[in-house]
Swiss-Prot record:
One of its GO terms (biological process) is methylation. GO terms for molecular function: DNA (cytosine-5-)-methyltransferase activity; DNA binding. Gene3D superfamilies: DNA Methylase, subunit A, domain 2, Vaccinia Virus protein VP39. The active site is at C76. The keyword DNA-binding applies. Pfam families: DNA_methylase. The gene is ddeIM. It comes from Desulfomicrobium norvegicum (strain DSM 1741 / NCIMB 8310). This is Type II methyltransferase M.DdeI. Signal peptide: none annotated. It catalyses: a 2'-deoxycytidine in DNA + S-adenosyl-L-methionine = a 5-methyl-2'-deoxycytidine in DNA + S-adenosyl-L-homocysteine + H(+). Its EC number is 2.1.1.37.
Length: 415
């Protein structure tokens, strides 16, 4: 099936669908560096580097019949394009452009990704944002269900919960359990941070290079998967740190952050190295446990985390591994940016992305839905029995993954 990707970022969402056999025919992303990353890794896809609010879908020279699905994650920050409007009303946000494209292309399905907080968000008039979203899609002929997925359930070495609004045309049966991809691993076999990055070159602060050789062979299935088709390591450069910062990192133990260090290693006021800063962000400089999935990698992960074993922040490649980007996926633009620079750094691109393995699981589930639409329409078929039967058909047994069959009934909602 053909898809178009709105608010495409660097392409994590699209890449997951590609791994599931979909064909991306168009991506729209206004940030130059993220767009360059997308184009570099998807040379056969038409990428438009423009603000989506300025685009008319009728001018894109894409036939409506060629579009089977639309995916994307419109940013929820601010939820407003006008200062006098309700900032939390999605009808005042970029969300309306997602609806606009869905209305024009009339795809078989759409998937819209967002953060967990959107489910509890209300407007000034006390309406739930999620209800308004469902209503707006209903107005253009779609039913919506909402599922909450955690990336670590799908082989990603990261605990990352995200919300997915899945839309189908109103004449299609919509069942939440059927559209929820089955978990691919049990909790005791989650991919850990150490399993994800332990084969990468050992570097200290300020070391590394844009292209390096692998120092060792893959040590596990995850590393084998990430290294398929890759002959070297890209984007593995560690940031430079002052000695004061390196000493602070050395004082932080697993599970601790900057808030746990002694006064000797506390953050200092900007421009005054002798005065302790009154502001301490507990999420900064956190040293994650190596033998568990990493906590959520956000756009600010360059300062959020330090390596579990070395006294430095993660590299962009380590972040990409944690997000399940393959090593063949090479990031463009600067590694980091200053506050006044307008483009998205490699770290920001990676942290903003939908993990490809998570996207792949969702894409495979949608494919399964359309392949079994006749059975789903049959009211004599037990939904629960059908869901359980489908778990085994969705598995890649060659990768020796395990199934959890009892947890897919409490993380879905429908409208």
């Amino acid at each position: 099936m053909n898809i178009i990707d709105l608010f495409a970022g660097c392409g994590g969402f699209s890449h997951g669908f590609k791994m599931a056999g979909y064909n991306s025919i168009l991506a729209i992303e206004k940030d130059l560096w993220a767009s360059q990353t997308y184009s570099f890794n998807n040379p056969n896809v038409s990428v438009i580097t423009e603000d989506i609010t300025t685009l008319d879908p009728g001018d894109l020279k894409i036939s409506v019949s060629d579009v089977d699905g639309i995916i994307g994650g419109p940013p929820c920050q601010g939820f407003s394009l006008s200062g006098n409007r309700d900032q939390k009303d999605p009808r005042n946000s970029l969300f309306v452009d997602f609806v606009r494209f869905v209305k024009f292309f009339s795809p078989k399905f759409f998937v819209m990704e967002n953060v967990l907080g959107i489910l509890s968000m209300k407007t000034k008039s006390r309406q739930y944002v999620k209800d308004i979203i469902a209503e707006e899609f209903s107005n253009v002929g779609y039913k919506v269900c909402v599922i909450i997925l955690n990336a670590c359930d799908y082989g990603v070495p990261q605990s990352r919960q995200r919300v997915f609004f899945i839309g189908l045309k109103s004449d299609r049966p919509l069942n939440q359990q059927i559209l929820t991809p089955p978990s691919k691993v049990i909790e005791s076999e989650y991919t850990s941070l150490e399993e994800a990055i332990s084969d990468l070159p050992v570097i200290e602060a300020g070391e590394g290079g844009e292209v390096q050789d692998y120092p060792v062979a893959p040590r596990n299935k995850y590393q084998e998967n990430m290294r398929k088709g890759s002959t070297c390591v890209y984007n593995h450069v560690a940031m430079r740190h002052t000695q004061r910062l390196v000493d602070r990192f050395a004082a932080i133990k697993f599970g601790q952050s900057v808030k746990h260090v002694s006064e000797e290693h506390s953050q200092r006021k900007r421009g005054d190295a002798n005065s302790i800063s009154g502001k301490v962000f507990s999420q900064n400089n956190m040293r994650p446990y190596p033998y568990k999935p990493c906590p959520t990698v956000a756009a600010s992960f360059q300062s959020n985390f330090i390596h579990p074993f070395y006294n430095r922040n993660f590299t962009a490649r380590e972040g990409a591994r944690i997000q399940s980007f393959p090593d063949t996926y090479i990031f463009q633009g600067k590694r980091t940016t200053m506050s006044w620079e307008k483009h998205l750094s490699q770290y920001q691109q990676i942290g903003n992305a939908v993990p490809p393995l998570l996207a792949q699981a969702l894409a495979e589930r949608i494919s399964w839905y359309f392949e079994n639409i006749n059975l789903i329409n049959d009211s004599n078929v037990s939904i629960k029995r059908m869901v359980q039967r489908s778990f085994m058909s969705q598995l890649n047994l060659e990768n020796n993954v395990n199934v959890r069959q009892d947890d897919n009934y409490d993380k879905v909602h429908s409208f």
